[in-house]
Swiss-Prot record:
Protein family per UniProt: Belongs to the sodium:solute symporter (SSF) (TC 2.A.21) family.
Organism whose genome encodes this protein: Rattus norvegicus (Rat)
Catalytic activity: D-glucose(out) + 2 Na(+)(out) = D-glucose(in) + 2 Na(+)(in); D-galactose(out) + 2 Na(+)(out) = D-galactose(in) + 2 Na(+)(in)
Function: Electrogenic Na(+)-coupled sugar symporter that actively transports D-glucose or D-galactose at the plasma membrane, with a Na(+) to sugar coupling ratio of 2:1. Transporter activity is driven by a transmembrane Na(+) electrochemical gradient set by the Na(+)/K(+) pump. Has a primary role in the transport of dietary monosaccharides from enterocytes to blood. Responsible for the absorption of D-glucose or D-galactose across the apical brush-border membrane of enterocytes, whereas basolateral exit is provided by GLUT2.
Molecular function (Gene Ontology), one example: galactose:sodium symporter activity
Gene name of the encoded protein: Slc5a1
This protein's name: Sodium/glucose cotransporter 1
Membrane topology, record value: Multi-pass membrane protein
Comment block on domains: The cholesterol-binding site is formed by transmembrane helices TM1, TM7 and TM13.
């Protein structure tokens, strides 16, 4: 292997030690400080300028958002630091196939904006389980889904993001991982708890801009260093580590040579690491679950001013999703070229020396590039970008998780909870989540790092498909009823969780030491498993629904696609269940207009302002105003001109998606 592709930093055996000293200069530190000050300022501005005193205001930003913050926020909530670490790492290990995961989303943001969101808005819901309750009646599906979603957040999103953020801080600052995580979560929680959804969406928009600028600059540096695109394709295939045997260990050749199909998205259906049928069909099922039924994503769309803004926001997000292939996957591959011995290490002893885990160091591909290539000041900017993507993902998840908990679980435990109590419960729940997340970090830390991105995708493949099946059928097949949906979800969950537990018990193995899990269980690629699980769930739901009583149309107006334009009044299936709460006379306060209002103390005023609980000063809404508000919340009309504009853009986006897949296939 020609030594010219190796940077001098790698030849020293104590490479990681040098990296720690990198961000100890004035330029970098001042950039990071300025960045955090700006973020806090934006959060505070959103906190004082929007209504957070109502559940609709805190959780849905009062349905007043325009298209560009929605698009940016969809993108930022999706791209966490797990993407920077995971996508770049998989790129370094196996080429561009993981980029296909990002491009698949181009199709599904269109499906979300054009097919799913209109139904959710007409149903007038805040959370996804709430939609299923209106559609099927009964509470068991709603509670089951809320709990499952919270589990998925903790196991995949929160833990993976925190872990990859910690890798970064550790490489750049040399801080103890737990200290770093504590500081991060404190800042994140502060403006989620105080600001509500508007703060989250505005800070997301700011962070998307910073993320894109920073990663464009880094990609430029990386391609310049490697000598352009042609040289990049050529050198990647030759990026083989120098140390491949160690006394009695000799590593198999396929464990350290780049894959022959590194530059193809579609790979062999049987021997490929990303089989093409799995990438087209299996991944589409996961994308349907993630983009069209996941609380974090849908909540962004529900906060839009009107339907045209939803569609435009989705289209913007689709165009942004073209970028990760070029801004994350390819820089990860370049990192392997520049620091081959470090990133592509195969000997457990070498890997342990470079990144502390024996299974491989591809996870540090992106952080290494930042720390080694960027000049002072810009390096601080890139660290801010990583923190930005981590924090924006976490704030989105914290806000959505507290929405799920407050609206779907807490209201069942405390039937007569006041608006104020709900607001406080939602904020306290965020603190509980943070506690669980920190406790989960050591488990993720010890999960072999080489599997981080695969870990996220595979857990999604085991738990997501039944949810996707139920939502798809709920919207497009009005014959489906509650028993069918419930048992479909339960059976799907049992099959998925048994595969997940088996795989964790045996471990997924690595190239050096394959797992000894029974072939019949773990031998099926997780994307194929998603297809099988989805099919089983769909069949179960349909069969049980056809054997039981259908739901009368009067309960389904505007809840499924075939009845989406009906104007008749809908009798909600859950209408009878929500018995009106008798207000305790001692809870109601007679307000004498003449009596002077008691002045609150300074501390109490500050507390109320901080938590958005001070908004009792405005007049109460009249019945007519409430009806008008309800109409606004469920309105999906569009102006003809803008409808045409967004539709044309949607078609262009789909054409771009097809072209990208074909070009790199």
């Amino acid at each position: 292997m020609d030594s010219s592709t190796l940077s001098p930093a790698v030849t020293a055996t104590d490479a990681p030690i040098q990296s720690y000293e990198r961000i100890r200069n004035a330029a970098d530190i001042s950039v990071i400080v300025i960045y955090f000050v700006v973020v806090m300022a934006v959060g505070l501005w959103a906190m004082f300028s929007t209504n957070r005193g109502t559940v609709g205001g805190f959780f849905l930003a009062g349905r007043s958002m325009v298209w560009w913050p929605i698009g940016a926020s969809l993108f930022a909530s999706n791209i966490g630091s797990g993407h920077f670490v995971g996508l770049a790492g998989t790129g370094a290990a196996a080429g561009i196939a993981m980029g296909g995961f990002e491009w698949n989303a181009l199709v599904f943001v269109v499906v979300l904006g054009w097919l799913f969101v209109p139904i959710y808005i007409k149903a007038g819901v805040v959370t996804m389980p709430e939609y299923l309750r209106k559609r099927f009646g009964g509470k068991r599906i709603q509670i089951y889904l809320s709990v499952l979603s919270l589990l998925l957040y903790i196991f995949t999103k929160i833990s993976a993001d925190i872990f990859s953020g910690a890798i970064f801080i550790n490489l750049a600052l040399g801080l103890d991982i737990y200290l770093a995580i504590f500081i991060l979560l404190a800042i994140t929680a502060l403006y989620t708890i105080t600001g509500g959804l508007a703060a989250v969406i505005y800070t997301d928009t700011l962070q998307t801009a910073i993320m894109l600028v920073g990663s464009f600059i880094l990609t430029g540096f990386a391609f310049r260093e490697v000598g352009g695109y042609e040289a990049f394709m050529d050198k990647y295939m030759k990026a083989i580590p120098t140390l491949v045997s160690d006394g009695n260990i000799t590593v198999k050749e396929e464990c350290y040579t780049p894959r022959a199909d590194s530059f193809h998205i579609f790979r062999d259906p049987i021997t490929g690491d990303m089989p093409w049928p799995g990438l087209i069909f299996g991944l589409s099922i996961l994308a349907l679950w993630y983009w069209c039924t996941d609380q974090v994503i849908v909540q962004r769309c529900l906060s839009a001013k009107n339907m045209s803004h939803v569609k435009a926001g989705c289209t913007l997000c689709g165009y942004l999703k073209l970028l990760p292939m070029f801004l994350m996957v390819m820089p990860g591959m370049i990192s392997r070229i520049l620091y081959t011995d470090k990133i592509a290490c195969v000997l457990p002893s070498e890997c342990k020396k470079y990144c502390g885990t024996p299974v491989g160091c591809t996870n540090i591909a992106y952080p290494t590039l930042v720390v080694e290539l960027m000049p002072n000041g810009l390096r601080g900017l890139m660290l801010s970008v990583m923190m930005a993507s981590l924090m924006s993902s976490l704030t989105s998840i914290f806000n959505s998780a507290s929405t799920l908990f407050t609206m779907d679980i807490y209201t069942k435990i405390r039937k007569g909870a006041s608006e104020k109590e709900l607001m406080i419960a939602g904020r306290l729940f965020i603190l509980v989540l943070i506690g669980i997340s920190i406790a989960w970090v050591p488990i993720v830390q010890s999960a072999q790092s080489g599997q981080l991105f695969d870990y996220i995708q595979s857990i999604t493949s085991y738990l997501g498909p039944p949810i996707a099946a139920v939502f798809l059928l709920a919207i497009f097949c009005k014959r489906v009823n509650e028993p069918g949906a419930f048992w479909g979800l339960i059976l799907g969950f049992l099959i998925g969780i048994s595969r997940m537990i088996t795989e964790f018990a045996y471990g997924t193995g690595s190239c050096m030491e394959p797992s000894n899990c029974p072939k019949i269980i773990c031998g099926v690629h997780y994307l194929y498993f998603a297809i099988i699980l989805f099919a089983i769930s769909v069949v179960t739901v349909l069969v049980i629904s056809l054997l039981t009583k259908p739901i009368p149309d009067v309960h389904l107006y505007r809840l499924c696609w075939s009845l989406r334009n009906s104007t008749e009044e809908r009798i909600d299936l859950d209408a009878g269940e929500e018995e009106p709460v008798e207000e305790d006379p001692k809870d109601t306060i007679e307000i004498d207009a003449e009596a002077p209002q008691k002045e609150k103390g300074c501390f109490r005023k500050a507390y109320d302002l901080f938590c958005g609980l001070d908004q009792d000063k405005g007049p109460k809404m009249t019945k007519e105003e409430e009806e008008a508000m309800k109409l606004k919340m469920t309105d999906t009309s569009e102006k003809p001109l803008w409808r045409t504009v967004v539709n044309i853009n949607g078609i262009i986006l789909l054409a771009v998606a097809v072209f990208c897949h074909a070009y790199f296939a």
